[in-house]
């Protein structure tokens, strides 16, 4: 039988509140982000029998995953495969700063995200290749397991589009709040 994946976006961070682009940069969870992760952990421990937890190696995802792991009594395995998209020159910038300094590229990112090339950043297709390879590896290694994947907004949406065999141009059709849980 196939594995079941529980794909989770990390809890709220300080940069989420400020509206800064995170990418590979990091911002710690806020008190609300910790509370979100604790609520999710409680719900998951009551409703699901989880076998493994894998997390992006970026701090905000690790913080979220460790709260889940402590509640579920499962050690968290960290991996670069679940990292957020690298936003290059945009990391740490506010959306208004990006619109001002990179207007043409930002317009492309919003209208044709599958074609956009952020300066010194990754593309959606790079993220798709990375996460598809990771899911394939998990499916070869495990069978009929319940696996939590703690990751990031863009990465979650790319994964979901991939599971749905949908194009990356549809990335904005999927919304992901902090600690959103997607079961596939």
List the model feature ranges, each with a label:
Residues 55-56, 129, 150-151:
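Short beta-strand scaffold positions
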Residues 7-13, 150-155:
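Histidine-centered catalytic micro-motifs
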Residues 28, 71-130:
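Phosphate-handling substructures
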Residues 2, 62, 132-183:
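Active-site-adjacent alpha-helix immediately C-terminal to a catalytic or transition-state-stabilizing loop
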Residues 38-45, 128, 132-140:
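Generic structural signal for well-ordered alpha-helical scaffold segments
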Residues 12-78:
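Active-site-proximal alpha-helix that buttresses catalytic centers in soluble enzyme cores
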Residues 2-12, 104-107:
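Short coil-to-beta-strand
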């Amino acid at each position: 039988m196939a594995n079941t994946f529980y794909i989770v976006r990390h809890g709220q961070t300080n940069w989420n509140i400020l509206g800064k682009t995170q990418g590979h940069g990091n911002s710690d969870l806020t008190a609300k982000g910790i509370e979100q992760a604790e609520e999710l952990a409680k719900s998951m421990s009551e409703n699901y029998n989880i076998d493994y937890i894998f997390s992006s190696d970026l701090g905000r995802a690790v913080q979220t995953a460790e709260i889940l792991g402590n509640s579920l009594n499962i050690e968290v395995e960290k991996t670069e495969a679940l990292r957020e998209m690298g936003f290059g020159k945009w990391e740490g910038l506010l959306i208004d700063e990006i619109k001002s300094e990179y207007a043409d590229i930002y317009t492309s990112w919003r209208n044709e995200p599958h074609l956009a090339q952020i300066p010194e950043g990754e593309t959606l297709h790079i993220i798709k290749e990375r996460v598809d390879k990771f899911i394939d590896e998990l499916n070869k290694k495990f069978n009929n397991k319940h696996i939590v994947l703690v990751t990031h907004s863009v990465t979650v949406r790319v994964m979901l589009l991939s599971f749905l065999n949908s194009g990356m141009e549809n990335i904005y059709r999927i919304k992901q709040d902090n600690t959103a849980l997607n079961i596939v």
